[in-house]
Amino acid sequence: MSVKIRLKRMGAKKRPFYRVVIADSRSPRDGRFIETVGTYNPIAQPAEIKLDEAKILTWLSNGAQPSDTARNLLSNAGILAKFAEVKAAKKSTAAKPAASATKPTEKNTVAEIKAYLDAQGTQYASSAKKADLLALV
């Protein structure tokens, strides 16, 4: 099921009012939706936008794709920037353990072995030889 963040039109004729909803991409524009996450009133001066940031970030992290207009609203509210930061932080923390997960061997340099031991929190003498450091691993 492909999930979208999009606008659902409400309001009277010539008086548009939109709800920002999470909906299955196959459902009609004003049809069934999963959850309401905000409102958008373009008639008000200035345009009135209310968004539930926590719910939107949750849905974005679960793979929901915003429509073009919803993307503009989220971008202007700063939610997409926060999502990009969260995603980058998650990616960088996931990459660090993978790099230090491999145990050093004889082929590694002393600096690489010391970096591994520092990441593990192991104490060692700064003047230790390579063989002594490998014994600590």
Swiss-Prot record:
GO molecular function, a single term: structural constituent of ribosome
Keywords annotated in UniProt: Ribonucleoprotein, Ribosomal protein
GO CC annotation terms, alphabetical: cytoplasm; small ribosomal subunit
Alphabetical GO biological process terms: translation
Ranges annotated as spanning the membrane: none
Keyword rRNA processing: no
Ribosomal protein listed as a keyword: yes
PANTHER family (UniProt xref): 30S RIBOSOMAL PROTEIN S16, SMALL RIBOSOMAL SUBUNIT PROTEIN BS16M
UniProt similarity note: Belongs to the bacterial ribosomal protein bS16 family.
Name of the molecule in the record: Small ribosomal subunit protein bS16
Name of the coding gene: rpsP
